[in-house]
């Protein structure tokens, strides 16, 4: 009998949720996703130091000899995302998702400008727009930024999605893909209800993604649904048939070593009816988010987590560039690093 991973791959596009190139080579997914936490983790692996140094040197050339370490590192944050994305694309046939700085999540214009810059860097590296998804947090401001970018031919992946109103707004904005989270929803319910275990079909995260998937397909939205943030393979099994599922290497390994029959649970050609299209304006969006403690808390937590990962990556890059440039003429006194 085929493994769960092989069976799943026949009905759903499997995406690797990692910046680890070795894991991507092992599991051979079609697409891959990254986020600030994954990039930070990869940046601490000795084998990837060459990629980090490449980005820092390229950033120094871009900023110029008299630019401060801080200016170089700010530039390098974008360069590193693209350097890792470029390497990932060498090992997959599909798309890589690269995330906009989470600290811009409530600034539409800054998000648009950052996304345009990331795409310019990819294009400069010879990579076309159709192989890149720009990840943006599913705030109202982020969704509006994605609407602008999609009109420009820049494809977006709206992440940190926990409430149905976020999904509906994304569909109306015409975004390419959304990443509704499963495991983080489960985490919240386990912590706040006193219920320690939820069977797969009753998992609140599974229920959320299933509703979104059927709503999109019933109403003929083109936006793809990619379930994300899994805690166990039972959640993945319950979403078999979803457009895409982005899965960590640990769970990909479990799927590849489990040999039981897999039933297709979601069918884009025969979706279950879940109601007519709903209009989501800014006021309704904020009202629905504010009345959903889980979604409000998890969106806030996710943005803070990714923002901290960027802060931590900046510190590591400042330390690294100081080592690389120590004693050189452009390591000016004004570049001193403060912790």
Curated annotation (Swiss-Prot):
Catalytic residues of the enzyme:
135
Q: Which parts pass through the membrane?
A: none
Signal peptide range in chain numbering: none
Tell me which Gene Ontology terms the entry assigns under biological process. Answer: carbohydrate metabolic process; pentose-phosphate shunt
A GO molecular function assigned to this protein is: transaldolase activity
InterPro entries, per the entry? Aldolase_TIM, TAL/FSA, Transaldolase_1, Transaldolase_AS
Gene3D superfamilies per UniProt: Aldolase class I
Q: Where in the cell is it found?
A: Cytoplasm
Q: What is its main location?
A: cytoplasm
> Which protein family is named in the record?
Belongs to the transaldolase family. Type 1 subfamily.
- Describe the subunit structure: Homodimer.
- Give the protein's recorded name: Transaldolase
């Amino acid at each position: 009998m085929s493994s769960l991973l092989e069976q799943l791959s026949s009905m759903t596009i499997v995406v690797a949720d990692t910046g680890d190139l070795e894991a991507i080579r092992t599991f051979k997914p079609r697409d891959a996703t990254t986020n600030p936490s994954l990039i930070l983790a990869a940046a601490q692996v000795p084998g990837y130091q060459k990629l980090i140094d490449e980005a820092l040197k390229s950033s120094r050339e871009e900023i110029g000899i008299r630019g401060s370490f801080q200016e170089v590192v700010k530039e390098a944050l974008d360069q590193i995302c693209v350097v890792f994305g470029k390497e990932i694309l060498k090992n997959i046939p599909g798309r890589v998702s690269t995330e906009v700085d989470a600290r811009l999540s409530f600034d539409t214009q800054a998000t648009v400008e950052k996304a345009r810059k990331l795409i310019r860097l990819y294009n400069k590296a010879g990579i076309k727009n159709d192989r890149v998804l720009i990840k943006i947090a599913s705030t109202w401001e982020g969704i509006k930024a994605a609407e602008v970018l999609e009109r420009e031919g820049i494809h977006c992946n709206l992440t940190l999605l926990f409430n149905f109103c976020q999904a509906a707004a994304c569909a109306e904005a015409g975004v390419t893909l959304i990443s509704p989270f499963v495991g983080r929803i489960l985490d919240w319910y386990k912590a706040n209800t006193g219920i320690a275990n939820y069977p797969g079909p009753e998992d609140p995260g599974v229920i959320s993604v299933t509703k979104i998937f059927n709503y999109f397909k019933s109403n003929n939205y083109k936006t793809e649904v990619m379930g994300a943030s899994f805690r166990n393979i039972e959640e993945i099994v319950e979403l078999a048939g979803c457009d895409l599922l982005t899965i960590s290497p640990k769970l990909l390994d479990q799927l590849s070593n489990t040999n039981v029959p897999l039933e297709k649970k979601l069918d884009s050609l025969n979706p279950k009816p879940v109601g007519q299209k709903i209009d989501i304006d800014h006021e309704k969006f904020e009202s629905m988010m504010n009345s959903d403690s889980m979604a409000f808390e998890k969106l806030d937590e996710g943005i803070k987590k990714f923002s901290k990962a960027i802060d931590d990556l900046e510190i590591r890059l400042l330390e690294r560039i100081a080592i690389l440039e120590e004693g050189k003429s452009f390591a000016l006194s004004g570049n001193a690093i403060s912790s």
